[in-house]
């Protein structure tokens, strides 16, 4: 699966967020998890194996 910056992804743990940074090599990326008001709740590092879908 190809993941790009600003894609919205669903992680295998059920959280959804926007990819805000892809690390060199493209194997890991940073996902911003936000609430309904757009406030950032968490920034998590993830890999393709942690991703259920690009939505």
What is the meaning of each model-derived region?
Residues 2-55:
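Basic/aromatic-rich interaction segments and small domains that mediate binding to polyanionic partners
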């Amino acid at each position: 699966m190809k993941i790009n910056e600003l894609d919205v992804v669903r992680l295998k743990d059920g959280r959804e967020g926007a990819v805000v940074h892809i690390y060199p090599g493209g194997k890991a990326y940073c996902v911003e998890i936000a609430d309904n008001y757009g406030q950032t709740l968490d920034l998590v590092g993830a890999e393709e194996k942690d991703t259920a879908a690009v939505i």
